[in-house]
Structures are given as structure tokens and as C-alpha cells.
Amino acid sequence: MDIKRTILIAALAIVSYVMVLKWNDDYGQAALPTQNTAASTVAPGLPDGVPAANNGASADVPSANAESSPAELAPVALSKDLIRVKTDVLELAIDPVGGDIVQLNLPKYPRRQDHPDIPFQLFDNGGERVYLAQSGLTGANGPDARSTGRPLYAAEQKSFQLADGQEQLVVDLKFSDNGVNYIKRFSFKRGEYDLSVSYLIDNQSGQAWSGNMFAQLKRDASGDPSSSTATGTATYLGAALWTAGEPYKKVSMKDIDKGSLKENVSGGWVAWLQHYFVTAWIPAKSDNNVVQTRKDSQGNYIIGYTGPAISVPAGGKAETSAMLYAGPKIQSKLKELSPGLELTVDYGFLWFIAQPIFWLLQHIHSLLGNWGWSIIVLTMLIKGLFFPLSAASYRSMARMRAVAPKLAALKERFGDDRQKMSQAMMELYKKEKINPLGGCLPILVQMPVFLALYWVLLESVEMRQAPWMLWITDLSIKDPFFILPIIMGATMFIQQRLNPTPPDPMQAKVMKMMPIIFTFFFLWFPAGLVLYWVVNNCLSISQQWYITRRIEAATKKAAA
């Protein structure tokens, strides 16, 4: 049975790593070519069906008429006269042409730990990549559907900042056309990553006005700047949306390459996901919207929606709005904003284990204030939960260790007659009340927990740049000096010494190689995960040593 146990351990090690790689295939970002630099100078485009414009606006705006075909137009450069907005958690730039958010930084989330003054940049439309949030009014009278191009909004000032003691900031952009006055209003709240984008329509034209609000996210094919593939893994980079039948539906870049998607949805949301961060447009819950994904002529990927028709009589007023979230994947906040949005923190097929683990880990952290110590306490709780199972396993291995001399005698007695040897071993196990597979059970049980915790540490933004102590300054990435993986390998070696020695020399050599193999695998795993395994091994060693000594003492006493 030792060879079976050896094979099982080796298989589980390989399977666990293959499962992680499989996760990369199913959920990871596609290896797509980076966007051409020329595309990064393209203006925010307009939806399909917009008539040819003499100002060269591109064909990004979704048409209110589903049968319309896109007009391909020459792109133009972005307006240099951007409107800057700064709150305590957001720094963004709005292009007055169309009122799109073309740049967005997250000052609370540094790009790198060694440069805390440089914020992570989520949106960018003027550098080497394209990622922006667009919105407008299309349809029969929508200003974004004009033949002369998208509206040029005016603001009272070019810079807005949320002042100390101020809880809300409102930025109004104004535009008038043919007797209709438009205000595009951005409303920000202190400490919040969600903002409201509203359109106030004042129809003084003398005739009825009609149109539709649209909102969309546009991104190029460049990689995820917030993700690391050091372990051969990558988190999901792509679009997602909510439908009545599927609260979290992913639409990858490959899916969009295959063809556009169009669905009628009541309420819901559309989002673009990357490692740790998400951007989502959230329309009113009562609105019946047309959700669409597609790829534009510059190779950018678009997901968005067009809202229901808005009618404003002559002399009347109307307002329509949507919410934009652009920030970290904080599960509690996302759940408040819209049903299913918290599922963008994607724990994969083991979500039913990962979510309770994160919930417990979060509560421990609220008491301790350090994610490293929280992982240690979590490990102790998990070990306590599996204590009866582990104890039974260690008792079985201790008895195996006690009968090792008898097994050696059987090997000497039967030599190469493996059939008789196996029969004699099974009779011995039955007589000594030993379960030869008992030592494998804890490994089988721990693997789902191990993999679920891996994805918790990989996906949860709370772990990003979270320090523990000393040289571990980020639990979400590998140990920079590989100290924890080496300690983990040492604990595996010690634990192995407590196990019964396989009677076959080849099996014994294979078992001795296992700590080295595991250490190699763990070199590039997140430090938080290795910390969990080190603590788990230390607790297992203590428990196994105690049980082994008790059984050996009882065996000696019975023999006397």
C-alpha cells in the first residue's frame, strides 16, 4: 500500500498544479496581441448606425435602431483640453468631446509597493493602451447621433476637487443644440468608487424630442497590468454581464472575436474585469435595455447597453441616469450596488468553499488587523475542524510504523512472490486493525480547501500588497527570497520522518523526493498560500508526533 500512497501524493501534487493551469485556460486572459500605438490616439468612438460625420468621429455609439449598420469613419485625436476631477479615491479626466471618462487613477491603490505615490491607472486613452468609459444620448434626436459629430461640452472650470469636509462633488457639462439644452452631470461621493452619470434634458425647441441613453466600456487587446503570471496562471480578463437567467455571464475576448452578442435585459449590469479591479455600468433596475458586445474597426472590444426610448415634449424636461463603478473588487460593496456584481470576484468551481473561507478570513482580519496573522489563525481553525479525521489518519500511520518490522519480515519471507506478500500484508492489517488508506484521507480532504484558499489569495483585492512581517511585504505574490517555500519543504521532510518507511527501496527514494518536488512547485506560489501550508505542516507534525508517541508507548506496554 506504500506505493499506492506514494502515487496518490504525487498525483495530487500534479493534479493540483494542472487544475491551476486549467483555471488559466478557462478563466485567464487570452494571449492577445498588444494594441497598436496608433490606436491609442483614437478619439472615443460612436455607436453603430451613426451617420457619417464631418468631424471624423468613429463608429462606436450603439444605434437605437437594432437594424442599423455601423458607419466606418476616420478616427481623430483626443481633445487636449481635458476636464480633471479629483476625489479622495478617484482621479480622472473627462474629454469634453462626448463627455467620456478617458483616464482614471486609483490613489488608494499604488501601482507598486516601492512607489506608493504612483497610483494604479485603470483607464487610459492617451498612452500605449485604450480603456475608457463612454456614455451619451443617441436615437432620433440624440446629440451623439448628429451628423456633425459628438457634442462638445463646456464646463465652468477645467479642474474639480472634493474639498476637505465636503461629502459630494457635482461636475456639470453643458451643451445646447437646436433649442435643446443638455447637462451631463457627474456626481461623486467621498470614499466611493461608484459615481452617477445623469443627463438633464430641457427641450425648448418647440417640438418633441426623443432619444436613448447608451453606456459602454471600450478596451483594447493589451494584457492586464494588474496581473502576474509568475506561476503560469492568470486571472480572467474580459467582459461580463447580468441576465435574468444567468446572474454572471462571462464574454471573453475570444467570444467577441467570434461574433457580436445582443440581448434584451431588464436592469442588470455590464462590466469589464481584470485582476483585482472591475469597471461596470449599472442602469436603473426598471429599465429595459439592449446589451451588446462587439469589436470596432481599430480592434477594440466593446460591451455596453442602450436604454429605453426617452420622449420629451416641447417645453418639457426629462432626466435619465446610470451608475458607473470603477475600482477594486470589494465584494460587500459590489453586492450592494447590483445583484450578481459580487460574482466578478471569481473563485471558480470551488466558490462554495472559497466564499466561506474569505468570509471567515475577513472576520479574523477585523480582529487582528494583519492578513498574515489572519491566515495563521484561519489555518489553526481549519486544522481544528479536521482534527478528528487527521487524528484517525495519524493513528493509522502510527500503527503502520509499529508493524514495520513485521512487514519487513513478510518481505523477507515471501521474497518476490508479490501475490502472497499482498495477501499476508492484508491479513496483518486486518489483525492489527489498520486502514492502509487512512493516511491518504487528510490529503484528499485538504486539497479542495488548499485550492479554494489559493483562489481566495489570488482573487481577493484585500490581499493585494498586504504585508505580514519582516521580508513578507505582499502576501499575494511569491516570497522574494524563497524562505517560506524552503521552510515548507523542511516541514514536509520532518513530517515524512514520522511516517512509516516504505519497505521497497525505490518507493523510499520517491518519497524522499516529494519535499523537493513540492518545494519547487511552491517557489512561485503566493506567500500567503505557502504560509498556510507551513503552519498546517507544523500543526500536523505536532499532532502526529503526539499520537505516534502515545501509540508506541501503548504498544510497548502491551508487549511487556
UniProtKB/Swiss-Prot annotation:
InterPro entries noted in UniProt: Membr_insert_YidC (IPR019998), Membr_insert_YidC_N (IPR028053), YidC/ALB3/OXA1/COX18 (IPR001708), YidC/Oxa/ALB_C (IPR028055), YidC_ALB_C (IPR047196), YidC_periplasmic_sf (IPR038221)
Give the span(s) annotated as Disordered: 42-66
State the membrane topology: Multi-pass membrane protein
Q: Where in the cell is it found?
A: Cell inner membrane
Alphabetical keyword list: Cell inner membrane, Cell membrane, Chaperone, Membrane, Protein transport, Transmembrane, Transmembrane helix, Transport
One cellular component (GO) term of this entry: plasma membrane
This protein's major location comes to: membrane
Briefly state the protein's biological role.
Required for the insertion and/or proper folding and/or complex formation of integral membrane proteins into the membrane. Involved in integration of membrane proteins that insert both dependently and independently of the Sec translocase complex, as well as at least some lipoproteins. Aids folding of multispanning membrane proteins.
Name the source organism: Pseudomonas putida (strain W619)
- Where exactly are the transmembrane stretches of this chain? 1-21, 341-361, 367-387, 437-457, 468-488, 515-535
Family (UniProt): Belongs to the OXA1/ALB3/YidC family. Type 1 subfamily.
Write down what this protein is called.
Answer: Membrane protein insertase YidC
Molecular-function GO terms, alphabetical: membrane insertase activity
Swiss-Prot/TrEMBL GO biological process terms = protein insertion into membrane; protein transport
Underlying gene: yidC
Outline the subunit composition.
Interacts with the Sec translocase complex via SecD. Specifically interacts with transmembrane segments of nascent integral membrane proteins during membrane integration.
Record's Gene3D superfamilies?
A: 2.70.98.90
